[in-house]
């Protein structure tokens, strides 16, 4: 439960480690140390901070980009790895919460992952991006409804989304309905397709982060990364595709529940920390005017259904557990098991749980 009235937070704007996990872990710990030296309680990293965003899938044909696949897979983060334990131990040693963005390696697949590690080194939750964006689907698998999660911490109720999940109204509402107080908004660099697609720009996506705060009456900590010349060299960006990815693209910010920016922006090609003090009492003022999952909602007109049924790719069935069912009576139109439906407290979000 929340015990702090003021939370000092840091949003990272820095260059990712260019598909080098070991170097990335070192940099993660160093940035966490810098944030703690500034008195921060929480540090937030951008989308796929480890081992870096897979820009290669946007820069050429799928057959061309495959040459990066093995390296990217090998340097992605497993949550049961020594690398992850190093970061968790650093959180404990430094006494800081770490909201991490990473390419998660699980078995033979990758997922766009995020997790929250508390100041005791315990992972409070991990989640996966529900639907990777466009060509990201050639790299990453999908998440589940259970990944729309908000957890109670001493900092407040904390949840997270990745990148263009902030353009998904239903996913946002699922978090609003869990009374999120601090929102983690993980973004990559905004230097991709800067001349071709305004929707990918920092201007548009920082506006999405800002409106998230206003809609949800929460603090939004938006973290991003910076593309360097070393990144361009690694990805063989040359005359044929120079306009597709450029140096810079950083845009990190912390927004108040009324949409105010709480610190100055850094230059787009600069590395550093955006730091602000979050006065948690501001949430009550914002909620008094607009609470879309409370007094400003109309559940009899519109409501969200969150289906928490989880489907594994394999189900083990033992013969002794198989029960032969009697044939249904002629008048029975459906043999489907009933679905349990519950409504979250003080919310117009329905939770649907499949029968076990």
From Swiss-Prot:
Keywords: Hydrolase. GO terms for molecular function: nitrilase activity. Residues 324-356 are annotated as: Disordered. Residues 7-280 form the CN hydrolase domain. Changing residue 162 to N: Increase of activity. Pfam families: CN_hydrolase (PF00795). It catalyses: a nitrile + 2 H2O = a carboxylate + NH4(+). Its EC number is 3.5.5.1. Residues 332-356 have a biased composition (Polar residues). The active site is at residues 47, 129, 163. PROSITE patterns: CN_HYDROLASE, NITRIL_CHT_1, NITRIL_CHT_2. Belongs to the carbon-nitrogen hydrolase superfamily. Nitrilase family. Nitrilase that acts mostly on arylacetonitriles. Homohexamer. This is Nitrilase, arylacetone-specific. It comes from Alcaligenes faecalis. The lineage of its organism: Bacteria, Pseudomonadati, Pseudomonadota, Betaproteobacteria, Burkholderiales.
């Amino acid at each position: 439960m929340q015990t702090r009235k003021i939370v000092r937070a840091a949003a990272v704007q820095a260059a990712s480690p260019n598909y080098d996990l070991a170097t990335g872990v070192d940099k993660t710990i160093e940035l966490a140390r810098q944030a703690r030296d500034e008195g921060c309680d929480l540090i937030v990293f951008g989308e796929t901070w480890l081992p870096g965003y897979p820009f290669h899938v946007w820069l050429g044909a799928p057959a061309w980009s495959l040459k990066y696949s093995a390296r990217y897979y090998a340097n992605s983060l497993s949550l049961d790895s020594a690398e992850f334990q190093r970061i968790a131990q650093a959180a404990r040693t430094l006494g800081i919460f770490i909201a991490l963005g990473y390419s998660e390696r699980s078995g033979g697949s990758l997922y766009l992952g995020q997790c929250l590690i508390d100041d005791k080194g315990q992972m409070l939750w991990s989640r996966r991006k529900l639907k990777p964006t466009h060509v990201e689907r050639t790299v990453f698998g999908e998440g589940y409804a259970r990944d729309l999660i908000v957890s109670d911490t001493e900092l407040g109720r904390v949840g997270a989304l990745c990148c263009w999940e902030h353009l998904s109204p239903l996913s946002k509402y699922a978090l609003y309905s869990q009374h999120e107080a601090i929102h983690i908004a993980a973004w990559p660099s905004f230097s991709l397709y800067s001349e071709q697609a305004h929707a990918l720009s920092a201007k548009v996506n920082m506006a999405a982060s800002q409106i998230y705060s206003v809609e949800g009456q929460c603090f939004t900590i938006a973290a991003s990364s910076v593309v360097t010349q070393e990144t361009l060299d690694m990805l063989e960006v040359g005359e044929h595709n120079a306009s597709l990815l450029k140096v810079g693209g950083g845009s990190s910010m912390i927004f108040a529940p009324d949409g105010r920016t709480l610190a100055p922006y850094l230059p787009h090609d600069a590395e550093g920390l955006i730091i602000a003090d979050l006065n948690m009492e501001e949430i009550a003022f914002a909620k008094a005017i607009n609470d879309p999952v409370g007094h400003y909602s109309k559940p009899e007109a519109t409501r969200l259904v969150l289906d928490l049924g989880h489907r594994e790719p394999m189900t083990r069935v033992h013969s002794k557990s198989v029960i032969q069912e009697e044939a249904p009576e002629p008048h029975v139109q459906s043999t489907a098991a009933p679905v349990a439906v519950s409504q979250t407290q003080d919310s117009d979000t329905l939770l649907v749980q499949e029968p076990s």
